[in-house]
């Protein structure tokens, strides 16, 4: 495969599909540059004194790691001055972050989870950044939270970076999924995988099995059938994988198939799940569908959900299409 840079890919996509105007290309490049900076901070680890807790909580009531706050600040500072955004929203902030008046206002909205899987930071397991781009309403004067509450099908870009043995950036602009690897010597993103595809069938699943006693019947039935192996109703053996880092689990699925599940359960019946719709489930669902997979909340396509609030949570089932369809059918016949 011819090795091309992220910038060259974006320019050629614009020529072919006319879907990446200059302002959007700038936005993608700035986010990619911020991910390089985060990768550098993550890579320093204890040497950079960035490990451990920040002794604070985010809006979700989760204890923040130092790198959560550092990564959030990197993304805010990189993106607020360029004139391509109207506002930003983050897992780490209760309200939206409008672009300061001293900078020009752009026509896009950026949402992100600055450091997904941060429970893994101190033990050197892969973590990452997830982001989603929406179009702002025409003629917007001042961004409000309601402007962000668009269905996932309205996304114009989605992607994530994984900070692991290599740093990779996985991206869709609505025409397939491409993977770029950070060349640390040159400081550039180079395309290393084109048109990633998720096989429709799989023998791997990812779920936190320690919660099994709390699962609702459709999930319990589905997992029990897989665990029964060759002598069970599925007639084949399955392997379980669970990294506790959504970006790492989804990246594996994009490369070799599988199903990722984070269902609602009986621990907190009033909560519809743990993962956030706007900046976790939606961008990952967009990527997975663009790679030929499927993504639902057990009842409907994730990208069809109309959000009601910025930090809304949803159950998530995504990955190989035939498996997602099967577990979704169990929810509909419960």
UniProtKB/Swiss-Prot annotation:
Record-level GO cellular component terms: cytosol
A biological process term (GO) from this entry: sucrose biosynthetic process
Record EC number: 3.1.3.11
Location in the cell: Cytoplasm
A GO term for molecular function: fructose 1,6-bisphosphate 1-phosphatase activity
Subunit (UniProt): Homotetramer.
Entry-linked PANTHER family: FRUCTOSE-1,6-BISPHOSPHATASE-RELATED, SEDOHEPTULOSE-1,7-BISPHOSPHATASE, CHLOROPLASTIC
NCBIfam families, per database record: PRK09293.1-1 (NF006778), PRK09293.1-3 (NF006779), PRK09293.1-4 (NF006780)
Family membership: Belongs to the FBPase class 1 family.
Identification of the protein by name: Fructose-1,6-bisphosphatase class 1
Taxon lineage: Bacteria, Pseudomonadati, Pseudomonadota, Betaproteobacteria, Burkholderiales
């Amino acid at each position: 495969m011819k090795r091309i840079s992220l910038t060259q890919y974006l320019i050629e996509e614009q020529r072919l599909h006319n879907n990446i105007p200059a302002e959007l290309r700038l936005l993608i490049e700035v986010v990619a540059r911020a991910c390089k900076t985060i990768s550098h901070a993550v890579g320093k680890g204890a040497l950079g004194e960035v490990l451990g807790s920040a002794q604070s909580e985010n809006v979700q009531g989760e204890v923040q790691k130092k790198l959560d706050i550092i990564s959030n600040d990197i993304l805010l500072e990189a993106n607020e001055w360029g004139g391509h955004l109207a506002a930003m929203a983050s897992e780490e902030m209760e309200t939206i972050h409008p672009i300061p008046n001293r900078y020009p206002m752009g026509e896009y909205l950026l949402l992100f989870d600055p450091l997904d899987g941060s429970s893994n930071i101190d033990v050197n397991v892969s973590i990452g950044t997830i982001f989603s781009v929406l179009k702002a309403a025409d003629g917007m004067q001042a961004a409000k939270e309601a402007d962000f509450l668009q269905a996932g099908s309205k996304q114009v870009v989605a992607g994530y970076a994984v900070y692991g043995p290599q740093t990779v950036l996985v991206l869709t602009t609505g025409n397939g999924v491409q993977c770029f690897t950070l060349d640390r010597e040159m400081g550039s993103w180079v395309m290393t995988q084109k048109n990633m595809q998720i096989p429709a069938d799989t023998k791997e699943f990812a779920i936190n099995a320690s919660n099994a006693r709390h699962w609702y019947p459709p999930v319990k039935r589905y997992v029990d059938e897989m665990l029964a192996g060759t002598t069970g109703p599925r007639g084949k053996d399955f392997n379980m994988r669970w990294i506790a880092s959504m970006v790492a689990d989804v990246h594996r699925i994009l490369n070799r198939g599988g199903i990722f599940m984070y269902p609602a359960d009986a621990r907190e019946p009033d909560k519809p799940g743990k993962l956030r719709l706007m900046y976790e489930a939606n961008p990952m669902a967009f990527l997975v569908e663009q790679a030929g997979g499927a993504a639902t909340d057990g009842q409907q396509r994730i990208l069809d959900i109309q959000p009601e609030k910025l930090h809304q949570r949803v159950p998530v089932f995504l990955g190989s299409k035939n498996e997602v369809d099967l577990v979704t059918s169990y929810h509909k016949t419960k």
